[in-house]
A protein has these predicted regions:
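Alpha-helix exit/C-cap motif
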Residues: 49-53, 60-82
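N-terminal single-pass transmembrane signal-anchor helix
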Residues: 12-43
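Conserved alpha-helical elements of the SDR catalytic core
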Residues: 39, 46, 66
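Periplasmic/extracellular, small/polar-rich flexible segments of pilin-like filament-forming proteins
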Residues: 2-4, 71-166
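Residues at secondary-structure transition points
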Residues: 17, 49-53, 57, 108, ...
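Short, Lys/Arg-enriched N-terminal segments with co-localized hydrophobic residues
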Residues: 1-11
């Protein structure tokens, strides 16, 4: 007959002892590693798409502002036009507290403008690269190298995917 102290002091001798073996723990670690190797890149890609979508929204807002200025002044670059109200994406990043994902810039002549969103920080990993839109609603990616009015259907598809996510 075993005493209470004997069975408690050496649980390996107890036939009813429970626990996990090293193999079982290694299987769990391997499964977690596989799940994480899929989940983390998908989460990062989701963040990049979300930030890009916000930048496009800010670009369209700035485009509407440019059109209002043209309506008032008859020119996109009239000296009376105030500085653009949006210079970063997200908009609140300029006042501090948030990471700047894109820098928004505007170049204009009397009858044309191009709004450009240049990726910053983690957004530089975005395959769409620098985004731009002009007064004719021509959308471009990768710094203007591929645009929505290209002759190549695959280029137009790539631009559509970057600007709409579809």
């Amino acid at each position: 007959q075993q005493s209470f102290l004997t069975s408690r002091s050496n649980p390996m001798k107890n036939a009813n002892s429970r626990g996990f073996t090293l193999i079982e723990l290694m299987i769990v670690v391997a499964i977690l590693a596989i799940v994480m190797s899929v989940a983390i890149p998908n989460y990062q890609a989701y963040g990049i798409r979300t930030n890009r979508s916000e930048a496009i929204s800010n670009m369209l807002e700035l485009s509407q502002w440019m059109e209002r200025q043209f309506t008032v002044f008859g020119s996109y670059n009239d000296p009376g036009i105030a500085a653009p109200p949006i210079t970063t994406s997200p908009k609140t990043a300029a006042s501090g507290g948030a990471t700047i994902n894109y820098l928004l810039s505007n170049s204009s002549t009397a009858i044309t403008y191009t709004i450009t969103a240049t990726p910053q920080a983690n957004q530089t990993n975005d395959s769409c690269g620098t985004l731009s839109i002009d007064q004719a609603s021509r959308e471009c990616i990768t710094g203007g190298a591929i645009c929505s009015d290209d002759a190549s259907a695959s280029n137009r598809t790539q631009v559509r995917q970057c600007f709409t996510g579809k």
